[in-house]
């Protein structure tokens, strides 16, 4: 939707063999490859499950499926992973095994660094003291909904500070300070009402005609709406506190350095 700050490397232009444009044909082709990858992963997991069954070890095995990041593939007019929208930031996390009720879903938040601790817990192994993650075992066994109520995200590609994001409950804030300060944006989303983080651009008549999707009025960036000034203030303060807690060396144009 706007040049969000990777001036030295636009993956769909500069990287040979990746993507040549954001045309409809390119997006359709890349989506087809994405779906093919998903189908292949499903087949490979199936082979593992069948092998465990034959070995008689399926009921004694924990299977964890996750990934390091997603990819836009046309969503928000982007092609790569250089963003903090849900399609690229949120990754799958599926677990099966002894003591984990099938068909259940937890709403809680976690980082990938929270995977090793529950693996140790479930296997009866002491968690190394150097590990910074939290154990998801109470969530996996249905004792808790979450171990974290706040998630923090950062992307520093291109000019600094780049992008930062924070999520709490249904609310999510994304800030951009890129392209040597020429792009400075703030986005606020209610993910319950706007799970795909749709923008005002998605409400354009030509976009609606092409996609067949008619977004609701609240499915936009709420940061510019005075009605949500309290939510914006709370999320801005939360983002700054997370940046300080994690010793982020950068600040955005409207944040104090203290």
Annotate the PLM regions.
Residues 90, 111-122, 135, 139, ...:
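Generic recognition of well-ordered alpha-helical segments
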Residues 147-154:
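WW-domain-binding short linear motifs
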């Amino acid at each position: 939707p706007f040049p969000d700050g990777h001036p030295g490397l636009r993956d769909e232009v500069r990287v040979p063999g990746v993507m040549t444009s954001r045309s409809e044909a390119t997006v359709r082709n890349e989506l087809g490859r994405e779906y093919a990858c998903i189908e292949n992963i499903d087949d490979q997991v199936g082979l593992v499950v069948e092998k465990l069954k034959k070995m008689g070890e399926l009921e004694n095995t924990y299977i964890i499926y996750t990934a390091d990041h997603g990819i836009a593939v046309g969503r928000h007019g982007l092609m790569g992973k250089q963003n903090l929208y849900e399609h690229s930031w949120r990754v799958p996390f599926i677990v099966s095994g002894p003591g984990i009720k099938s068909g259940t879903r937890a709403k809680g938040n976690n980082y990938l660094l929270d995977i090793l601790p529950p693996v140790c817990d479930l296997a009866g192994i002491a968690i190394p003291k150097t590990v910074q993650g939290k154990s998801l075992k109470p969530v996996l066994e249905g004792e808790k909904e979450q171990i974290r109520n706040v998630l923090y995200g950062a992307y520093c590609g291109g000019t600094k500070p780049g992008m930062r994001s924070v999520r709490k409950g249904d609310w999510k804030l994304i800030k951009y300070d890129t392209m040597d300060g020429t792009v400075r944006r703030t986005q606020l989303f209610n993910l319950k009402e706007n799970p795909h983080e749709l923008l005002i651009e998605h409400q354009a008549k030509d976009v609606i005609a092409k996609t067949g999707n008619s977004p609701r009025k609240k499915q936009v960036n709420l940061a510019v709406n005075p009605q949500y000034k309290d939510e914006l203030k709370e999320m801005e303060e939360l983002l700054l506190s997370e940046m300080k807690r994690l010793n982020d060396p950068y600040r955005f144009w409207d944040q104090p350095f203290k």
